[in-house]
Amino acid sequence: SVPPLSAPLVRKTFKKYLGKFPEEIYDSFTPDALNAASIGQVHCATKDGKKLAVKIQYPGVANSISSDLALVKPFATRMFNLKGKDSEKYFIEVENKLLEETDYTLELKQSIAMAEACKHIPNLRFPIYYPELSSERILTMDWMEGQHLSEFTSKNTDSTKGNKIGQTLWDFYMYQMHHLRQVHADPHPGNFLIDENENLMAIDFGCIKKVPNEFYVPYFELADPKTINNPILFEEKLYQLEILRADDTPEEIVYFTGIFHRLLRLFTQPFHGDY
């Protein structure tokens, strides 16, 4: 785990990126972090009667990403049996997404846009974000009171409440995928909270993945019974999605086609009948 930023370093970060010290910006500010974020830490503040969460990025994160990935790349190539020069695009994708997560100005923009686009979904809440209190390394939003999703699921025994949360998650991601054609690509339980009324609260939109048509169309055609039940068509879609590649061996083609066929048949079963 990364050691928390000291109070003097927190003050220095504010002065550098917002031009003022925290006590000049907020009515109150906790000098010590209350929570950890993926690449930073979260402080509590108040301003104009509102309780706020202030996320501050650890220094040097953005600068270390490329060098760290260069060290990991040889091991990942062997571990995941990545072949050919085309594997480079996967590393570029990972690097670009990690760098995007270090840009809190981008996260601010994406968070506001996602909250606005999905505000109609029942039982789903988002914090309000404050551009005037944010920068490329500092992000200020409403403090959201609630249990983390993992804590809720470990303690909850009420199926009605669980179904309500599950339905909200489903509605949220289906709307993103099929209407926005982009998804919140960091959906671990720490990025979801449950309030006292069993509303789902979604936070941390630093990683958003746009879904291009050339992926969307063949991916969801895989769920069509006509595709699943047609071996030639099914294999064609796997090639379109680069699950199968031209340089795969006959053994690899048989192996991966079989795995994905079994998974897709099982996964799509609830959509092909009444249960």
Model-derived regions: residue spans:
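Catalytic-loop of the protein kinase fold
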Residues: 179-189
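Conserved phosphoryl-transfer catalytic core
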Residues: 226-231
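Short amphipathic alpha-helical recognition elements used for nucleic-acid or partner binding
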Residues: 218-221
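Broad phosphate/nucleotide-binding scaffolds in NTP-utilizing and phosphate-metabolizing enzymes
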Residues: 1-168, 172-174, 194-199, 205-213, ...
